[in-house]
């Protein structure tokens, strides 16, 4: 049941230093035996309290709005909004890819951003995918996990964030870095604090509605089949994030680099 939920669901010195610092911090937690894919939840009482508030807000406001949006907004408009939100995230993805040491992917991401922002009319249409520029989605939560010398499951302590939901130390710091280097946030806040907060609020609200509308069935199914919805969501989040980090490290991380070197040695 949790697996079904999981399935549905150069100039970067400062970010690199932050990644290294958090990776070292998480490395210090590596000795804690929490079991494979077992979340470390030392503040469970506080997390459950925040979860209950988030749950109430979801029942009263977010879910009903998401249902109306899904049922009444024309599908092309829904796709357009989703595309715009994805396009706004491309610059941060490109920066994260540079820090991860994959400049080729970063170049593709920037090309996607330029194509979709112009020909795609501010990102409404994903023209880039149609012409063979594949999408990747990165952030500094992934980047910290990529470099951290610990098992992918060890993202630090589990935390439930107000209005955001499941997270952990690694991903929480990653989100903070993402927000601090986002070019659109920097530009709008440089205009005025009012402009910055209006932009941030509008983008956050649109993201919440878009994401919630896309997870209605998955979350309903998870809750319906769970004895403890909090624990089920915590487990699903931890397993999903661990798998994402594991795949990243296996495909492009240190282990993959060693395998490439071994293959070259055999060829020679």
Over which residues does each language-model region extend?
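C-terminal motif of bacterial Sec signal peptides marking the signal peptidase cleavage site
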Residues: 25-28
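Bacterial signal peptide processing site
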Residues: 30-33
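A structured, mid-to-C-terminal "fold-capping" secondary-structure block
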Residues: 37, 142, 146, 150-268
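N-terminal post-signal-peptidase region of extra-cytosolic proteins
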Residues: 50, 66-81, 100-101, 108, ...
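Surface-exposed, polar/charged faces of alpha-helical domains
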Residues: 74-79, 86, 97-105, 130, ...
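Mid-length scaffold segments of soluble, non-membrane domains
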Residues: 87-169
């Amino acid at each position: 049941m949790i697996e079904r939920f999981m399935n549905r669901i150069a100039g970067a010195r400062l970010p690199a230093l932050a990644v290294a610092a958090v990776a070292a911090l998480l490395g210090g937690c590596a000795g804690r035996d929490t079991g494979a894919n077992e979340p470390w939840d030392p503040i469970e009482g506080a997390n459950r309290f925040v979860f209950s508030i988030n749950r109430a807000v979801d029942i009263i406001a977010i879910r009903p709005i998401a249902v109306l949006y899904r049922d009444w907004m024309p599908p092309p408009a829904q796709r357009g909004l989703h595309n715009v939100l994805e396009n706004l995230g491309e610059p941060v993805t490109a920066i994260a890819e540079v820090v991860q040491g994959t400049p080729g992917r970063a170049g593709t991401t920037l090309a996607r951003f330029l194509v979709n922002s112009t020909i795609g009319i501010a990102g409404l249409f994903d023209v880039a995918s149609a012409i063979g520029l594949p999408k990747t989605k990165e952030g500094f939560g992934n980047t910290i996990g990529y470099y951290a010398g610990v098992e992918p499951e060890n993202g630090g302590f589990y935390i439930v964030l107000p209005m955001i939901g499941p997270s952990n130390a690694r991903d929480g710091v990653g989100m903070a870095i993402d927000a601090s280097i986002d070019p659109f946030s920097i530009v709008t806040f440089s205009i005025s604090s009012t402009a910055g907060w209006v932009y941030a609020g509008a983008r956050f609200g649109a993201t919440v509605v878009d994401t919630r509308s896309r997870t209605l069935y998955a979350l309903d199914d998870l809750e319906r089949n769970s004895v403890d919805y909090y624990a089920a969501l915590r487990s699903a989040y931890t397993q999903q994030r661990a798998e994402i980090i594991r795949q990243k490290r296996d495909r492009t991380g240190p282990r993959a680099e060693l395998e490439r070197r071994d293959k070259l040695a055999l060829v020679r």
